[in-house]
Amino acid sequence: MEVKVFRVKGVFERLGKKQPFTKEYRALKQEHVKELVYSEIGSKHRVPRTKIWIESIEEIKPEEAEDPIVRKLSLEL
């Protein structure tokens, strides 16, 4: 299986305020990315999954990645 690069956009609510986010991940499937988003944002910001809304998950080319770590890992292969 091939590892793909995904860009996730969404919003989470913390202390009554909505905070937009954009994250990039390397994963095999969209379902894995969704779980990573819930896990990372929930852990880092202490937000329950019900307060995290994922608006879009799109597969992108490794060259389009804005996160330097994701780009470097993807292009080294």
Curated annotation (Swiss-Prot):
The keyword Transcription regulation does not apply. GO terms for biological process: translation. It holds the Pfam family Ribosomal_L18A. One of its GO terms (cellular component) is ribosome. SUPFAM superfamilies: RplX-like (SSF160374). Keywords: Ribonucleoprotein, Ribosomal protein, RNA-binding, rRNA-binding. Transmembrane segments: none annotated. One of its GO terms (molecular function) is structural constituent of ribosome. Signal peptide: none annotated. The keyword Metal-binding does not apply. Part of the 50S ribosomal subunit. Binds 23S rRNA. Belongs to the eukaryotic ribosomal protein eL20 family. This is Large ribosomal subunit protein eL20. It comes from Thermococcus onnurineus (strain NA1). The lineage of its organism: Archaea, Methanobacteriati, Methanobacteriota, Thermococci, Thermococcales.
